[in-house]
């Protein structure tokens, strides 16, 4: 036991010295995003505020997922009934700084579809990989009862259409809601992308 502690200490020092644990996926996603870095930072801040507004209302952080792109807010998840849906939307609309708000909030089904939804999500990601114009790392995917919700910022109208076509062809997909956005003036990235 005594010889293990110095070894662990050395390992810790080496790990920290090599940069430590970094969120490499998030770093790569930010560097190749269609949004500029300032818009990404503002979106992160608005997303936190949106999540806090939902939590203050008593919503489970696992039931409703907030997203923000170019100042536009989205809330996605199952709700128990119309009253909960109205409450979620009311809380989200109270967030200052959001330019708009859209939602996909279907009623929770009586039977769980979680296992099928996880498998469908994996298949949807796999279907998007062969389309470099989409940039699968820039598309957030939610699957609710077999219905796929696509969110994010893509580089062209062709990429938006390709994403919907590819996803609709996946086995198990019952429908597609396309919340993919194109870069708007003032929000677009200022550097060329290598993909």
Predicted regions and their residues:
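N-terminal targeting leaders
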Residues: 2-7, 12-195
